[in-house]
Amino acid sequence: MQDGSSGAASLGNSSPDATDCVVCGDKSSGKHYGQFSCEGCKSFFKRSIRRSLSYTCRATKNCAIDVQHRNQCQYCRLTKCIRMGMRKEGRRSNETQTAVSAVQRGRLPVTMPSLFPPNMFLRSPFPFMSVPFNPLMTAQFTKPSIKESIFEFAAQTIFATVNWARTSMSNLVKGDQLILLRHSWTPIFIFALAQSNFALNLSTHLTAVTATAASTENGSSSLGSKSEDEEKSEEKPERVFDEPQFQGFQAKIDKIRDFHLDVVESSSLRAVLLFSCDEEALEEKGKIEEIVEKLKSAVDEYCKMNKRSERYHQICECLQLLKSTRNLPISRLFFSRLLGTTPLETILSDLLITPPPPTLPFFPQLPSRN
């Protein structure tokens, strides 16, 4: 365990410059084509896109792209530019800007309580898990509609997740940070949902948000009356989940709740979800795998310390269950009204490189609706 403490100590000590180039890590000269980039990568991307240039990789299409090697493979450099979110239109669309602003602002009261109890410190060798998540004062809600509440919960959760993840990954290169966040976002959101009061009556909530998601995708949420012909020809919106899929989703949520994870187990599991990724595009894959192993060792020791050796296997079972949710259509379910047609990956990328406000709640938990 001593090795785990020393090996992970550097994770929370230093943070890369927020204006580093997202492609090669060199000093950024500003935001170009939608992302912070250096003059070299900006010019390379501009030239490649405007001239519609086509490149070939002489290796395995997985070349390292950093300050020293960025000129060695144009194919991999352009691929990384695109993967990191550089776009030929150069600026975020109005819809994307609106979505990001909405997520950043949130619409829940700023006094919303945290998921964690007061003065709870996590015993872990990782500095980013040793920060207390101080709850805010309990808020009095004005009985919003069910779907309004769950959309607000979704917006607050995505914002809290990105800011927590930014701290957790602060010593990794930005490209890996974005890959990890995109890869783990769905299981982390499902985990937050399972631990919220929405999970107690998920059928009602999903019926509301499914109808909203379907109408948004079919353009029926726009204002204005429809002609008689339009109303007759309008088809019933397709449900995001059919009945068997919904039952499977509900069963997974119920099973996650049945594990009754405590605050240390929950935080450790969330961190393992964030860093568990087998994408070949990761630049620091060995370092990330080492973090996962140390996290698992810390959880194992915590279970043994509490004389519950079988608990570790139960937590691993919960981990696999959460990983199995990775392909669920949560973007369509919970973010359709907030994001419109903007991909959730774009919002995650933009939030990750945007400096956080001074004070944030962690994972929100709405009060029970009686």
Curated annotation (Swiss-Prot):
What's a single GO CC term here?
nucleus
- InterPro entries the record matches: NHR-like_dom_sf, Nucl_hrmn_rcpt_lig-bd, Nuclear_hormone_rcpt_NR2, Nuclear_hrmn_rcpt, Znf_hrmn_rcpt, Znf_NHR/GATA
- Domain named NR LBD is located at 95-355
- Main subcellular location of this protein, as a coarse class: nucleus
Q: Which domain of life is it from?
A: Eukaryota
Question: Tell me, what is one Gene Ontology molecular-function annotation carried by this entry?
Answer: nuclear receptor activity
Task: Name the SMART domains on file.
Answer: HOLI, ZnF_C4
Q: Tissue specificity, please? A: Expressed in spicule protractor and retractor muscles, and the male-specific neuron CP9. Expressed in the nerve ring, and preanal ganglion. Expressed in asymmetric motor neurons. Expressed in ventral D motor neurons. Isoform a: Expressed in males and hermaphrodites. Isoform b: Only expressed in males.
Record localization: Nucleus
Residue ranges forming the DNA-binding region read 18-93
Q: What biological processes does GO assign it?
A: cell differentiation; cell fate specification; intracellular receptor signaling pathway; negative regulation of inflammatory response; negative regulation of transcription by RNA polymerase II; neuron remodeling; positive regulation of transcription by RNA polymerase II
Q: Where is this region: AF-2?
A: 344-355
Answer whether the UniProt record assigns the keyword Metal-binding to this protein.
yes
Q: Where are the zinc fingers (NR C4-type)?
A: 21-41, 57-76
UniProt feature, compositional bias: Basic and acidic residues: 226-240
Residue ranges of the region described as Disordered: 216-240
One Pfam family linked to the record: Hormone_recep
Composition bias type Low complexity, residue spans: 216-225
* Keywords associated with the record: Activator, DNA-binding, Metal-binding, Nucleus, Receptor, Repressor, Transcription, Transcription regulation, Zinc, Zinc-finger
The entry's family comment says: Belongs to the nuclear hormone receptor family.
Report the protein's function. Answer: Transcription factor. Involved in motor neuron fate determination and maintenance, acting as a transcriptional repressor to counteract gene activation by transcription factors unc-3 or irx-1 in subsets of motor neurons. Probably acts by binding to specific promoter elements. Required for ventral D (VD) motor neurons to adopt their normal synaptic pattern. Suppresses expression of flp-13 in VD motor neurons to ensure formation of the correct synaptic pattern.
Protein name in UniProt: Nuclear hormone receptor unc-55
For this protein's source organism, the top of the classification is: Eukaryota, Metazoa, Ecdysozoa, Nematoda, Chromadorea
Gene name, per UniProt, is: unc-55
